[in-house]
Amino acid sequence: MAIQSSSSGSKPPAPKRLVAPEATAAEGDGGRDEGLRPRRLADYIGQSELKQVLGIAVEATRLRNDALDHVLLYGPPGLGKTTMALVLAEELGVSCRIASAPALERPRDIVGLLMNLQPRELLFIDEIHRLNRVAEELLYPAMEDFRLDLTVGAGPAARTRSLELPPFTLVGATTKAGSLSSPLRDRFGLIQRLEFYSCSDLEAIVSRSAQLLQLELAAEAAAEIARRCRGTPRIANRLLRRVRDFASVRGIAAVGAPVVVEALAMHRVDGRGLDPSDRRLLSLLETSYGGGPAGLDTLAAALGEDPDTLEAVVEPFLLQLGFLQRTPRGRVLTDAGRAHLEAA
């Protein structure tokens, strides 16, 4: 069972878009999605290569009766990094303490976490690329030698006091592996990327979640949700909940594909998972700039969006679908993107 960190750091605001991959406050650790998480590797759908690598590491750790090597999980948001950390803890029969790097502002925050670890426990740090320098440097000897080096005093009278820590496993999660410093990255024994999920895996995830939610969902309905969730289980479960709400209010006991289409059309999510923000960008490129190229700042100003938000939140999925291209001269609408607009 996960043990929540007691830090007072504020949570990020909930995303306004239904198809945003970031977790809302209600979906976070201990939130609504907690009951939908798989508990064991055998229950974890998708990420077959990752499961194989971690399965071997877990079994070897059991045979040695030792702590699992430190693990770095990276990839886009919503793909199951937190879930995998909790699964690893369950497989090893230990607790998992959860913290977010932005909340570890002061040295005593990370010191408190490390000092309270039990032998072979997991410490999960989300957004680990956002650790400040002091917290990161405290982790170096802790990860390498299970030792905590504390500086006592200041100036010429300062001295270092070393405290032994029990063997533990740090599981770091990040969407920006390239932002980690080399000394921190090199201390992870296992570095694994989570990939976007296939449509068949997402259908299985949606069907499993529907059973847990006690929702009668037809196979073709699960497929409709899977096609719209951008390869991301978190979005799949969010869309499923909106379909469940719709069916409940309309008094629909058995949910088929037409119900899913109607329910998600109310939220303006189309058959490829695009929402109004996505379509506005594609439409602007076509109608105002002849398909492009158009600069990011120009597009952001025309849409009333922040350029960083446009680049980090709206564009990635359009690039993944091949509806948009980034060129040295600016953004360009592809033939596939134009065809999608015409079909809408």
From Swiss-Prot:
Q: What is the protein name stated in its UniProt record?
A: Holliday junction branch migration complex subunit RuvB
Please provide the record's keywords in A-Z order. ATP-binding, Cytoplasm, DNA damage, DNA recombination, DNA repair, DNA-binding, Hydrolase, Nucleotide-binding
The gene is ruvB
Matching Pfam families: AAA_lid_4 (PF17864), RuvB_C (PF05491), RuvB_N (PF05496)
Instruction: Look up the record and report any one GO term of the cellular component aspect.
Output: cytoplasm
Native organism: Synechococcus sp. (strain RCC307)
Binding residues annotated for ATP, in chain numbering: L36, R37, G78, K81, T82, T83, E144, D145, F146, R187, Y197, R234
Q: Which PANTHER family match?
A: HOLLIDAY JUNCTION BRANCH MIGRATION COMPLEX SUBUNIT RUVB, PTHR42848
Q: Where is this region: Disordered?
A: 1-37
Q: Where in the cell is it found?
A: Cytoplasm
